[in-house]
Every structure is written in structure tokens, then in C-alpha cells.
Amino acid sequence: MLKHKTFINRISHSIKHYLSFHVSIANLKKISFFISLFSCLTSGSIMLFSLFSSSLHELYGINYLHINFIASLSAIGMYLCLPVLGYLADCYGPSLLSLISIWFFVPSYFVNSQVIKSLEYNNVMKIHLYAFGICFFFIGLATSSLYFSSLLTCAKIYPEHKGLAISLPVTCYGLSTLLGSQLMKLSYFKQYNGFLNLHKVFNFFGVLYLVMGILNFVSSSVVSMESEIIFTNEDEMEEADEESPLMTSRSRHSHHSCEDDDNLIPERSIIEPLKHQERFINFLKDKSAWLLLASLILNIGPMESFQNNLGSIIINSNSESNLSDQVSIMAASSTVTRLAMGGLSDYLSSSKRKFPICRVNLLIINLAIGIVGQFMVTRSTRFSIVSILNGSSYGGLFTIYPTIVASIWGIDMMGSTWGSFMIAPAIGSIGFSIFYGNEVDNKCGVDYSSCLQHYFNLTAVGLSVSLILIIIVWKGIWAKRGYRVF
């Protein structure tokens, strides 16, 4: 890995040397920030899987159990690898993740396009399913690499505005689904029967991510090399209390002492976090982190499954809604919520307010919306309302959770900490997606009227348990440590 770091630093130094003659530090920050946002805006192709799955089922006869097997492998690649990716980003810089995204995005999409070209209806062999599964695993890995590289770049450029610095890339990532679903409506990507021409779609994404990967590498490598200048200017040092993680700033003003708390106190760092391995181990020993992980599994799993199986859900809930329209509605509501929650979390929790409100309250509201959204899937006559509720909850969760993690354990550790939490969507998505596929294949061939009611009753219960766990962590652990508002 040292060779990788030397290679990346060499290229980064060349980029920095060239740009230093043309761009000021202030503009360098802005350029890197906007390139990272644009990368997020194009990185959500994996979130269009519900559009891909409809074509795979209708055009090639792949059943929903196999489709959910492929979706589960993409979730494993997307989320289960994030702890390692986050740790690498903290130690070697986010530019390494940009290279990883190029290595896996481009060949995977091109291989998928060739596999699709060789398929015929009801003539799909196991080798084809394995090829799809492996490629979507790597596409998931590449998605996380590109997105996480952009997210960390944004968060580390403007650490004094955690909510917005995190919510803007998260919002752009959500918006990428909306833009992608509209892009897939173009006649170029359609076949004569109205379904997607996956050969053209996969080739398009292969070329797109080659370009975006290179741009993102330039952006993130510049940030890696300029970190010392960017993060140590006088204005930021004056606001160190606001920028520092809770367990640093609060410890200066609190008189309570606890051995467990002391082990968790993060330290401010410039490029590579001080005592990173030791602090990461202490984070893994924190019981509140494990309870927070369990809550994330129980709420994000149903949301991921809902998004991956949206086409099947519309059909089996007797709705006449258009799939592309519902994907757009869900993406739009998710995008608006991500942006709103980022700004609200910064404003409501600000220490400058007379009565600051903890970010956890926003998380509780998001979970309540998600519970209603899951419960209404088989009971509402207007599916657009269901898409809005579930999209809003999904977007809010992916904004508030990382903001809370950055506030509690520190932005300089965010790659490792938030990356570790990303095993939750992998576990949750796999479990709930396989469960959904089994329910549909076994029950919905007989009775379409209520075949999904049992499944969505259980997902609503899962989100309710998640809400209870959040309250326990906040009131039962963090509040006792003195962290009531953050």
C-alpha cells in the first residue's frame, strides 16, 4: 500500500505544481468541492437497478429471486467494502478511492453489455447470472469508492459546516437517481417494446465513469496535497470548537469523567489522523456504535429493498403507476429531504441558538415517516404518496446518520467510522431483498390483492424497533456522557 501512496502523491504533486501557477487556494477549494458534487451527481447508476431489473425479467425471463440475488451482490460490494475503503481514504487520501472506481466501474459495465448482447429470452444460464452478480458486485464497490471519495473531499474542505458539507454531496447522489431515471426515458436507450436496451445503457455508463473517475481523481488528489494549507487557516482555527467532534470540544467544558469516554476522545489532525488505529479500535468497542449499527440495519434494509424492487411492488400492489415516474418521484423527494435535513441539522443544533435542538430529533421524524410509508404500500390507492414518504425517509436517513457520526466521533475519522456503519445497508438490503423475492415468487402468483401485506407489516415493525434503539442510544448512553445536544 505504501507504493500506492507514493504513486498517488507523485501524481498529486504534479497536479498541485501545475495548478499553483493558475489557481488560488480559495478557488482550489471551490473547484475541488464542485467537481466532487458533480461526481456525486453522476455516481448513482446502481440506484437505477429497479429499471434494469424490469428489463431483465421481462426481456430475458430472469426470475425475481435471481434478480434479488444480483441486487444483493451489488449491495455487498457497495456497502460491505466501505469500512476498508473508508480506512484507506483516511490513511492514504480519497484519491485512492477515485482510482478504485475507475478500475471497477469501466470493465464491469462493458462486461455486462457483452453478456446482455449474448442473451435470449428464457435462455439464461448460471454462468450469465454469475457474470451479472460479479459485475454488479464490482459496480457496487466502484459506486461506493466514487461517492465516498467525493463525500470525504467535501466534508474535509468545509468541516465547520458539517451538515451542509455532508448533505450537499448526499443530495447530489440522490439527485443522480432522478436525473438517471429521466435520462433512461430517451429513445436512444429504449427498445421497440418500450423496455431499456441494456446493451446501450451499460456501454454509456462505462464511458461516463471513465471520464468522471479521472476528474474526481484530480479533485481529490489536489485536496490530499493541499490539506495542510486548507485545514489550518486562521479562520478555521478560530472556530476549532465548532469544527471539532463532540467528544473533543465537550470534554474541555465537562467535569464528568469516565474511562470509556476518555478512550473515545478524538484528536484533531491535518492529513492523517493521529493514533488512527488506536482510536478506531476504541470506536469499535463503543456499545453505542453497535446499537446505532443495529438501528441502521433495521431501517435502511427495508428502504433499499423497496427501491430495488419498486417495479415488482407496483405490479403486485395492483397499482397502475408508471415505474419511471415513481422512480423520479422517489428520487425527487429523497433529494429535497437530503438538502433540507442538512441545512436544518446545522441550524437547529447550532450553539448560537438560544434553544438548540439535537439532530437526533430529525432522525426520529425521518423514521416515523418511513414507518408510515412502509405501512401504506398495500393500503394506499395513490402510489405516489407511498413513493414520496419512502423517498423522503430514505434520503433523510442517509443525511442525518453520517452527520451524527461525524459529530460524535469526528470528521477526521469519518472515513473509518461512517464506512464501518455501511455494513448495515449490506446486511439489511441482502436480508430484506431475499425475503422479498421469496415472498413474491411464492405468494404473488396466486393472490395479487394482499400478497405483500405480510412483508410490509414486518418492515414497518423493523423501522419501529430501529426508532426505539435510536432513543435508547441517545437518552440512555450519549445523554449520560453529557452529549444531549449536537
Curated annotation (Swiss-Prot):
Cleaved signal peptide residues: none
Keyword hit for Cell inner membrane: no
Subcellular location per the Swiss-Prot or TrEMBL entry: Vacuole membrane
Main location: membrane
List of glycosylated residues: 322, 390, 457
Region (Disordered): 236-260
Functional summary from the UniProt entry: Probable transporter.
Name of the protein: Probable transporter MCH1
Species for this entry: Debaryomyces hansenii (strain ATCC 36239 / CBS 767 / BCRC 21394 / JCM 1990 / NBRC 0083 / IGC 2968) (Yeast)
Encoding gene per record: MCH1
